[in-house]
C-alpha cells in the first residue's frame, strides 16, 4: 500500500435520535443517525402487522365488486 493516500481510520461515536451511543471504526469521528437497533420496531418487538384484507373488502364493497 502506498503511504499518505488512505483516509485516517478512527473510532467513531455513533449517536441515535433515541439517545443510544456506540462506537465503531470509520473515517469520521462522529455520526448522528435517526434509528438504531434499540429503537427500530423490528428489533424492539413492537412491529405492527397491517391487515390489508379489511382494506380490500372495503374497496370491493365501495365499488360493488365480487
UniProtKB/Swiss-Prot annotation:
GO terms for biological process: translation. Binds 1 zinc ion per subunit. The keyword Metal-binding applies. One of its GO terms (cellular component) is ribosome. Zn(2+) binds at residues 16, 18, 36, 39. One of its GO terms (molecular function) is metal ion binding. Its cofactor is Zn(2+). Keywords: Metal-binding, Ribonucleoprotein, Ribosomal protein, RNA-binding, rRNA-binding, Zinc. Signal peptide: none annotated. It comes from the Bacteria. Binds the 23S rRNA. HAMAP family: Ribosomal_bL31_1. Belongs to the bacterial ribosomal protein bL31 family. Type A subfamily. Part of the 50S ribosomal subunit. This is Large ribosomal subunit protein bL31. It comes from Nitratiruptor sp. (strain SB155-2). The gene is rpmE.
